[in-house]
């Protein structure tokens, strides 16, 4: 990447946006270890690239824990959050890590204190994150500890700011408190994340599937969910389902 270039070339560190898979406290200097690299489209295995482009398989990019100063208004929000948590008697260790990457700040938080953190972000006059714009899930695959993440995008209409909260979960214990009592807009989004990823939002008023039938087996956006499909004939050639295609490596 050249000195004036802002977008990394394919294959360079920083060109992939894989997320972290494990959590460390904010005071620890250790970095996340993703344990895998990103693959391209069409079921590529190995490099799978004969063009010389080099962008079908990229090294895993893992943003390091951020250190003060975070820059801009990020420090103001972080200071306000920790002060509000102290006033509520919530330990500072409930914020496991802070990451600043691509101009966005993410707070990785302990699920046991998620509701208190959300209330502090919503109600504190210096913060005023009044709206939860979206709730989504991520599955980082079986190679990653705490592979399931519940992600919350919060918006302050008062100060015109956006932040992100993430809670990392074990696939064998995918429970996290529902934030519907704090942010009612999270209702249907938590249902969708439960439906697609199997993350269980404890305390949700009606946690049922919202996209798939009620008797559907499994959660379609998990990495270990079978792709399935039916063979498709096209101009005399048959294209098998993705998980039955031949590997050429």
Swiss-Prot record:
Annotated region (Disordered), positions in chain: 1-29
Molecular function GO labels: NADH dehydrogenase (ubiquinone) activity; NADH:ubiquinone reductase (non-electrogenic) activity; quinone binding
GO cellular component: plasma membrane
Record family assignment: Belongs to the complex I 30 kDa subunit family.
NCBIfam families: NuoC_fam, PRK07785.1
Entry's localization field: Cell membrane
Record-linked Pfam families: Complex1_30kDa
Gene3D superfamilies: NADH:ubiquinone oxidoreductase, 30kDa subunit (3.30.460.80)
Source species of the chain: Saccharopolyspora erythraea (strain ATCC 11635 / DSM 40517 / JCM 4748 / NBRC 13426 / NCIMB 8594 / NRRL 2338)
HAMAP family, sorted: NDH1_NuoC
Enzyme class: translocase
Keywords, in A-Z order: Cell membrane, Membrane, NAD, Quinone, Translocase, Transport
Lipid bilayer topology: Peripheral membrane protein
Protein name: NADH-quinone oxidoreductase subunit C
Chain's role: NDH-1 shuttles electrons from NADH, via FMN and iron-sulfur (Fe-S) centers, to quinones in the respiratory chain. The immediate electron acceptor for the enzyme in this species is believed to be a menaquinone. Couples the redox reaction to proton translocation (for every two electrons transferred, four hydrogen ions are translocated across the cytoplasmic membrane), and thus conserves the redox energy in a proton gradient.
Stored InterPro entries: NADH_DH_suC, NADH_quin_OxRdtase_su_C/D-like, NADH_UbQ_OxRdtase_30kDa_su
The keyword Chaperone belongs to this UniProt entry's keyword annotation: no
Subunit composition and interactions: NDH-1 is composed of 14 different subunits. Subunits NuoB, C, D, E, F, and G constitute the peripheral sector of the complex.
E.C. number(s) listed in UniProt: 7.1.1.-
Catalytic function, reaction form: a quinone + NADH + 5 H(+)(in) = a quinol + NAD(+) + 4 H(+)(out)
Main localization of the protein described in the UniProt heading: membrane
Keyword rRNA processing applies: no
């Amino acid at each position: 990447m050249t000195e004036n270039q802002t977008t990394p070339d394919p294959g360079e560190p920083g060109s992939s946006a894989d997320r972290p898979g494990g959590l460390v406290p904010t005071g620890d200097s250790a970095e996340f270890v993703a344990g895998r690299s990103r693959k391209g489209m069409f079921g590529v295995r190995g490099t799978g690239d004969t063009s010389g482009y080099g962008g079908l398989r990229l090294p895993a990019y893992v943003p390091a824990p951020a250190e003060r100063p975070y820059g801009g208004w990020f420090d103001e929000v972080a200071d306000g959050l920790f002060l509000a948590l102290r006033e509520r008697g919530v330990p500072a260790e409930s914020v496991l890590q802070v990451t600043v990457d691509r101009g966005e700040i993410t707070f990785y938080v302990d699920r046991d204190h998620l509701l208190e953190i959300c209330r502090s972000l919503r109600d504190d006059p210096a913060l005023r994150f009044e709206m939860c714009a979206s709730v989504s899930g991520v599955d980082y695959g079986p190679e990653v500890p705490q592979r399931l993440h519940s992600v919350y995008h919060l918006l302050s209409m008062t100060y015109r700011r956006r932040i992100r909260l993430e809670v990392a979960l074990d696939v064998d214990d995918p429970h996290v408190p529902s934030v519907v009592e704090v942010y009612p807009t999270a209702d249907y989004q938590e249902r969708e994340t439960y439906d697609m990823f199997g993350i269980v939002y404890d305390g949700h008023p009606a946690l049922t599937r919202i996209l798939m039938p009620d008797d559907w087996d499994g959660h379609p956006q998990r990495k270990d969910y079978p792709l399935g499909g039916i063979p498709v004939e096209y101009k005399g050639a048959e294209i098998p389902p993705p998980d039955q295609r031949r590997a050429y490596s």
